[in-house]
Every structure is written in structure tokens, then in C-alpha cells.
Amino acid sequence: MTLLDGITSRLVDTDRLTVGILERVGDNPATAPEQTVVLIHGNVSSSLFWQELMQDLPSDLRVIAIDLRGFGETESLSVDATRGVRDFSDDVHATLTALGIETAHLVGW
């Protein structure tokens, strides 16, 4: 995986699954959670889609791009079709909880 300057990749263990994320820390590594932007990719994509935007956002923001279940570096677990997209939203919530982020701005497509 090729990452653009300033972007790092890591795995986050949650109580649901192991999630791959890309991260660009703000100017201050202790950036407050409310200064966090979380990017969520669309179908047949991954967090890699967001790299250019991650570099372009203001440098005072912490930016995280999450790989949804079965995409990118995130564990491939089955999705319960009776729950609609709730498996995905629960995975995102579990990831933010594992990262200690209680408040964030969500962006997706």
C-alpha cells in the first residue's frame, strides 16, 4: 500500500473486529476529539480513496479514514442483511470508541 506524505496506516482492535485506518494527525498530536474528521468510503472502495482530501484538509484537524468491514485492511466478517447498514455503523462506532473519540465530524459518500 502506497501512502501519501503525512498519512499513516494502522490496525485498531475493537470489541467487534479489527479495523484498518489511515490517519493524519493535526499540528498538535493531542488534537481535541471535536477537531477530528472521520472519512467513510463508499462501496467497492477503501480508505485509500481519501488520501488526497486528507492532505488538503486544514492542518489543525485530526483526520481518520476507516476501512469498512470486508474492505481494505479491515477484517472480513459477514454482514447481517436483516440489519441493513447497522453492522457498518456499529463497526464505525466501535472504532471511534477504541480510539477514545467521543465526538467527530463524519464525511462519507
Feature map (PLM): residue ranges:
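Active-site loop/oxyanion-hole signature of alpha/beta-hydrolase fold enzymes
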Residues: 22-28, 65-109
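Serine-hydrolase catalytic-loop signature spanning alpha/beta hydrolases and amidase-signature enzymes
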Residues: 42-52, 63
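Alpha-helical elements of Rossmann-like donor-binding domains used by nucleotide-donor carbohydrate transfer enzymes
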Residues: 7, 49-52, 56, 87-94
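Active-site donor-binding loop signature of nucleotide-sugar glycosyltransferases
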Residues: 14, 42, 68
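Alpha/beta-hydrolase fold catalytic core
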Residues: 1-37, 58-61, 87, 101-103
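The conserved beta1-alpha1 loop
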Residues: 38-42, 109
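Short glycine-/acidic-enriched loop or helix-start segments at secondary-structure transitions
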Residues: 36, 49-50, 74-75
